[in-house]
Amino acid sequence: MLEYLIVGQLINTHGVKGELKATSQTDDPQRFKKLKWVYIDKNGSLEKYDINGVKFFKQFIIIKFQGVDSIEEAEKLKGFYIKVDRANAVKLPENSFFISDIIGLKVYDENNQLLGELKDVIQTGSNDVYVVRDSDSKEILIPALKSVVKEVSIEEGKISVILPKGLLD
């Protein structure tokens, strides 16, 4: 499991006093208001930044970090990812998982036959869809429904599913 989770990306400066515009990579952008600090991933090197303020503008988050007080300083952070440590991550309900924790798990059908590896999760609004790549590099799209996904075991590195009839036809 990853120790740090991506929650956003700094995409541009905002104003001249060091604020940054960010996109959210979480289900709930309002979570940024509760954060006291985050880590900025500068090409693999994590630096902790205290948050002085958060506001929202259209679909973006405007963040003010302590010590970033000019457009020039903010410019240096553009493009980097915002991360939180797992201890400060949102607490998930039972049988819910962070996408980053399940990417890479092996997916097996009801006969314990390997279908492939989970490569991505498409969030459709109604239900997620697992993108599974088989050994021939073909993609299988599996709805992430309780009736389909029977077990997720991060410890064992596997997901067990019962495929809907006709899905592989």
UniProtKB/Swiss-Prot annotation:
Its main location: cytoplasm. InterPro entries: PRC_barrel-like_sf, PRC_RimM, RimM, RimM_N, RimM_N_sf, Transl_B-barrel_sf. GO terms for cellular component: cytoplasm; ribosome. Residues 93-167 form the PRC barrel domain. Keywords: Chaperone, Cytoplasm, Ribosome biogenesis, rRNA processing. It comes from the Bacteria. It is found in: Cytoplasm. SUPFAM superfamilies: PRC-barrel domain, Translation proteins. Signal peptide: none annotated. One of its GO terms (molecular function) is ribosome binding. GO terms for biological process: ribosomal small subunit biogenesis; rRNA processing. Pfam families: PRC_RimM, RimM. Binds ribosomal protein uS19. Belongs to the RimM family. An accessory protein needed during the final step in the assembly of 30S ribosomal subunit, possibly for assembly of the head region. Essential for efficient processing of 16S rRNA. May be needed both before and after RbfA during the maturation of 16S rRNA. It has affinity for free ribosomal 30S subunits but not for 70S ribosomes. The PRC barrel domain binds ribosomal protein uS19. This is Ribosome maturation factor RimM. It comes from Ruminiclostridium cellulolyticum (strain ATCC 35319 / DSM 5812 / JCM 6584 / H10). The lineage of its organism: Bacteria, Bacillati, Bacillota, Clostridia, Eubacteriales.
